[in-house]
Amino acid sequence: WSHSRLEELPALADSTWQPLPVREELPEETTVERAPTGDGTTLTISPLPSGGAHSLQEIYRENIASIVSIRGSKGDGMSLGTGVVMSEDGYIITNSHVIEGCGAVDVVLQDERVFQALLVGQDAQSDLAVLKIDCAGLTPAQFGDSTLLEVGDAVAAIGNPLGEELRGTMTDGIISA
């Protein structure tokens, strides 16, 4: 797409066109008015500490130890997914659909240790499940207050979308209305 092609579109021909600013030209801070977000349950990693934003690389390094793989056995097959360490004493959060219908569930830590998990509870509507493994000294993710999030806030997600086959992936985006 080029600027010269804008003239070919009547609706855009009379508009003022300017390139988007590059990163160095962006303001250091952007304010977005709070928008209604509904009353659903949300689980988030804590907001960045005051004093500046972290790079995606820093966020990754600070949180990758808290990301685990989930393996569930279902009849002749397996269910694979991601979990997040919630506490030092072995509580893990995952998606309910990952463990739904599984006879046994294993949690694989970043250091390759495998633990059989007990289901503490799950809620299909919010698609959340809490598991417990017999392991102490884990590195939990830092969870924050989701009521502090605003539309437009930057977020990042780290996970193992295919269990152990595709580990440690990361994506970023924004909170949308």
Identify the role of each PLM range.
Residues 2-177:
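Serine-dependent protease modules
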